Amino acid sequence: MEINIITNKINKLIQRKKDLKRYLDYVAKSTRILEIDLELSSTEIWKKKEYVHNLNKEKNLLNIIINKINNIEKNIKEMIIFLDLAIETKDNAIIQEISEEIKKIAEKIQELEFYRMFSNQHDHCNCYIDVQAGSGGVDAQDWSKILLRMYLKWSDKKGFKTEIIEESTGEIVGIKSSTIKVSGQYAFGWLRTETGIHRLIRKSPFDSGKRRHTSFSSIFIYPDIEDKINIEINPSDLRIDVYRASGAGGQHVNRTESAVRITHLPTNIVTQCQNNRSQHKNKEQAIKQMKSKLYEMKIKEKKEKQKKIEKNKSDISWGNQIRSYILDNSKIKDLRTGVEKYNVQSVLDGDLDDFIEQSLIMGL
């Protein structure tokens, strides 16, 4: 690669980095970190444990951005030094290394550029994914299991931690429902647009005639909000059921009624937890999920009111369908963004970024 081409590419990276610092408020974030450090240096403040916890959490979130930008700046400076060396020594091997490094830095910048999309209040939070089998019988339950695996695979590729909170196994195969927790940087921001109905069209492996079947599964994403969020729940509005856990779990499964199901009677919202052996801990977790769901419901209600004001009307049942997975034709199409993928297995193995990124860019 010619030196002037490499120089132009480096200059473009430098400009993108400058733009990045501007719209991600690098200076303001750096100043805020110094202010937090100053506060934390006071001995008196450590008496306020919750306040200190919140300060440290804010600092950690700010440092995610600052450290990434600092790392990019460092990489660019090192690359310029190597370029000068390559020009001086006329070493083509160094030039090749620089061209590879340019690609890596461009990818890092692109990742940070995407952080502009995470502007919602709880985008930085961990989140829960509820998977619920819809119409389609055994196929729908099998489809729900496939979707669950897809999101677990995607989370693993992102470096997110996952935990299965509750799982209700299907009558023959698959699952009727499941809740998983996804923990990581901007987990809710990444996943929030995945809420909706996912439609599967395929020749059913459970049909002896191998006829085409359509089945549905709903996905609901909601943030793992802090307990300080003011969501008041009247105890009389809750029905709490205990039952024996099902599925994998070792020798204690089905011996004690440790699993907890909570129903919020005014809204019929249900949360379940069975991953702890302690009924008390399961109840505590289910209550936390209930608060998160009720909060997300309030946010959605506000958005729906705004949509009505804007007269943005569409058929509810069709509008809730966000993506079609047509396995026989090897085609997956997002009905909102128009994004299509033809490597079906890759998507089912967690290759979702093209769908997610476009939905965030469009502000869905």
Swiss-Prot record:
Q: Which UniProt keywords apply?
A: Cytoplasm, Methylation, Protein biosynthesis
Q: Does the keyword Protein biosynthesis apply?
A: yes
Q: By its UniProt entry, which Pfam families does this protein fall under?
A: PCRF, RF-1
Coiled-coil intervals, chain numbering: none
Subcellular location(s) of the protein: Cytoplasm
Residues with the modification N5-methylglutamine, per the entry, are Q251
Task: List the SMART domains hit by this protein, alphabetically.
Answer: PCRF (SM00937)
GO MF terms here are:
translation release factor activity, codon specific
Q: Is Cytoplasm one of the keywords?
A: yes
Modified how: Methylated by PrmC. Methylation increases the termination efficiency of RF2.
First-listed, main subcellular location of the protein, grouped into a coarse class: cytoplasm
Q: PROSITE patterns, alphabetically?
A: RF_PROK_I (PS00745)
A single BP term in Gene Ontology: viral translational frameshifting
> A single GO CC term, please?
cytoplasm
Q: Which family does it belong to?
A: Belongs to the prokaryotic/mitochondrial release factor family.
NCBIfam families, per the entry: prfB (TIGR00020)
Other remarks on record? The gene for this protein contains a UGA in-frame termination codon after Leu-24; a naturally occurring frameshift enables complete translation of RF-2. This provides a mechanism for the protein to regulate its own production.
- What's this chain's function? Peptide chain release factor 2 directs the termination of translation in response to the peptide chain termination codons UGA and UAA.
Q: Know the name of this protein?
A: Peptide chain release factor 2
